[in-house]
């Protein structure tokens, strides 16, 4: 099994993110001892969000079902889409995830949505996903 773990937030790989990795990795290893885990930090890559070129929507086109924009995450998007699981760790800023993580998710997920009378997905597989977040709030809030 290959599992990708993403972390977004501050550029520095701080103690909160290190604790996230330890917590998530221990949980994965408890369930799947031989899991291959690839960690990545979104700020280690130079990329932008979707640019609305619609290359991913052109049926029978070379980019149909995948992002056609070429940059640092082009190959990574393919790898992540074939993973057997994904764990995303992120702080919450201004009631949402950081923009860099949002951009990655746009580029990863939007190509799989097909427009028609009904929306459906052409994703290569269903992927178990976990999202671990932190925010500056108490449990009561």
Language model feature labels by segment:
Residues 115-141:
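Short, glycine-/small-residue-rich phosphate/pyrophosphate-handling segment
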